[in-house]
Amino acid sequence: MIYLDNAATTLRKPPQVEQAVLDAMRTAGNPGRGAHEPTLHASRLVYAARCAMAKLLHAPDPSCIAFAANATEALNIALGGLFAPGDHIITTVCEHNSVLRPLYRLREQGLQFSFAGVDERGRLQYDDWDKLVQPNTKALVVTGASNVTGNGTDLAKASVFAHRHGLLLIVDAAQTAGSQPIDVQALGIDVLCFTGHKALLGPQGTGGLYVRPGLSIRPLVVGGSGVHSFDEQHPAQMPTALEAGTLNVPGLAGLCAGVEWILAQGVETLCAKETALAALFYKNIRDLPNVKIYGDPEMPLHAPIISLNIGDEDSARIADILWEDYSICVRAGAHCAPLMHKALGTVEQGVVRFSFSHFNTEAEVLQTAAAVQELAQEI
C-alpha cells in the first residue's frame, strides 16, 4: 500500500508516538486533579507537550499553548471568543470549513466578513486586500496553505497587512504546523490553530492554539479546571482559560513524542524532503495530456500537495481505481473547502489530491506517477 493522504491524517508515525500513548494510558492519572504520582505524572506529560509545541512554534512561553481536540475546535474557540456583533473580519476563499462554518454561524449573531479572492491557479492576490478593510474590521483569518491546491499563504505579507491596519492575525496551520518552519513571534501572529494528527505526527483527537501573550479569548467551554473550584467564573489565566475539563493525556503524550521527533530531525529537513517528493511527482505528471493540475506547485511556500483531474472523469472514480487497482490511498472530492472549488471551477468534479509525508519514498512517488500516466492514457 502507498499512502498519499497525509493532508487528511498521517498514517505512518515515529514508533515512539504509539509507545508514548500506551505508556500514558497505563500510568497517567488526571492532570491537575491531585497530588499523587499518577496525576503528577499526567501533569508533567501535558506540560512536556506544551513545551514541545511552544519550542516548535517559537512561542515566548509554554502557557501560550492551549490544547483542544483538533484544529476545528481551536478555530471555533478563537473565532467564537474574540469578536462581537458588528465586527468585520477579512478571510479568503482558500479556507476550510473549519473556518467558514464558524463564521457563517457567527454571521447569525451579527458578525460581518469579506473574502479575499484568488487567481485562476488559486493564488492569493495580496494587492487587493486593502480594498476589503472597513472601519469595523478586526482581524485577518488565513490558512497557512490550501488543503486543496497546496498553495501557501505568505504569512510575512499577511502580517504586514494585518498590523498596518491594526488587525489581529489568525492562522489556520492545519496543513503547515510540523511541515514548515513557523515563528509566531517573528511573524507577528496573534492566534495560530493547529491539529496534532497531520504533520505534527501525533494521534487523532489532539490539537490546540497558540495565543499571543496579553490577548484574551472568551472560552468556548467552561467547567472543571482543577483550580479555583469555589469561583463561579472559569479561571481567566492561560492556558486554563481555554482548557475546561480533562485533557486527552494519552493523545498529548503521543503528540509530544511526535513533535520532539520533528524537533530532533529539524523542521527544515522534513520540509525539504516533503517538498522534493511533491516536486518529483509533479515533474513526472505535469506534461501528461488529459491531466489538469490545480494550484501552482512551483511557487514558494507550497505544501506537499498536488491535486489534479484526468479528463472529465469524476475525481471519486479516479481515487477508487487508484485504491482498487494500485493500492494507492488518495483523497477525492471537495476536501471541505467549497469556496476554493468554486474559484477553480471544480464544484461538480472535485479534484484528486496526492499529499506527501517525510515517510514516503521516491519509489512510491514514481510508482504513483506511473499509475497516473496509465490512467491518463486509458480514460
Describe the predicted segments one by one.
Residues M1-I379:
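Pyridoxal 5′-phosphate
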